[in-house]
């Protein structure tokens, strides 16, 4: 193990992924996964040398508390002083940042200004940056923007049908998210298929508590489901996805809610949680649905139907489809969500092999469609942390 270690922090809306990555080998020295943050069930799991240790986050179930637990673990293994730089996933970089950047106060000001555009994620990202600056004073911090991959979308895909003056004044356009994940998954999928990425019309579904789908043609993003903010598109854990904008005026006029309350409801109390009235966690809902919980069943039906509709629509952006790729926590592990979604899409020639679908979970990648089937359906575990580490090393000059 070298001393060229990079700490990567990926603070999601309800999760924390942390990893210490050896820049020379690309190997993960230590990692952690904080799950179900902001709930009483919040836990953080540390992994090192094949050994795992789970610790409850009771009393520290926020992002800052999870980062603090990670930093304590680094000191325990004498890794703290060997960290050379810290890389952070940033959900929304706005129009100003189309690529990764060294973080200074001006960047922090811009990220704070983008909080209204990513109210669940940017505050979590900023918490990670502040914690790293506190525990690693003097070390460079790098922000890797989730929006940058989608800067290649054509104007017809990112333009909203609103007055031009508003679009220009407020940079009001579709940005897209999960770009760091797409940058990793797309070439990995191409490698599995044994074809150049530029020759594959690929649709990638990143499914987690936040979820989006991206159409990739000639190796570049040509359309995506998320828009100005991460609320647009698919049904997610607590976000509603696509909804009639008239809901805002209706609820403010008839339900006694102000705009901020409507915004909080659509971001934090909707999606799978809102439909099921049980949980935002897909694992919990799958178990409950099997046990006869009607709300859980409906939530999963709505989620998979919306996802299938978006997959079909993304084929327009690609001009067809050669490969459908599932990634993200749900996409990588839920055979039921994959099977149900693809069952709507046989008219596109998409099919799933039951045995392969069962096997490709828990870190296993590969093709889950029948061997004689085209287009291909794949599972590819994402590795946003490695992409962030590579960008961080490049910006700070760690060769």
Swiss-Prot record:
Q: What pathway is this protein said to act in by its record?
A: Metabolic intermediate biosynthesis; acetyl-CoA biosynthesis; acetyl-CoA from acetate: step 1/2
- Under which EC number(s) is this enzyme classified? 2.7.2.1
Q: Which UniProt keywords apply?
A: ATP-binding, Cytoplasm, Kinase, Magnesium, Metal-binding, Nucleotide-binding, Transferase
Which one of the record's GO molecular function terms can you name? magnesium ion binding
**Could you confirm whether the keyword ATP-binding appears in this record?**
yes
User: Which residues does UniProt mark as catalytic?
Assistant: 146
What is catalyzed by this enzyme?
acetate + ATP = acetyl phosphate + ADP
An example Gene Ontology biological process = acetyl-CoA biosynthetic process
Cofactor note from UniProt? Answer: Mg(2+). Can also accept Mn(2+).
Q: Where in or outside the cell is it found?
A: Cytoplasm
Q: State where substrate binds.
A: 89
Q: Which domain of life is it from?
A: Bacteria
Annotated transmembrane regions: none
Site note Transition state stabilizer applies to 178, 239
One GO cellular component assignment for this chain's record is:
cytosol
Instruction: Report residues binding Mg(2+).
Output: 10, 384
Where ATP is bound, by residue? 17, 206-210, 281-283, 329-333
Describe, as the record does, how this protein assembles with itself and its partners: Homodimer.
- Function of the molecule: Catalyzes the formation of acetyl phosphate from acetate and ATP. Can also catalyze the reverse reaction.
Under NCBIfam families, the record lists:
ackA (TIGR00016)
Could you tell me what this protein is called? Acetate kinase 2
Q: Which organism is it from?
A: Neisseria meningitidis serogroup A / serotype 4A (strain DSM 15465 / Z2491)
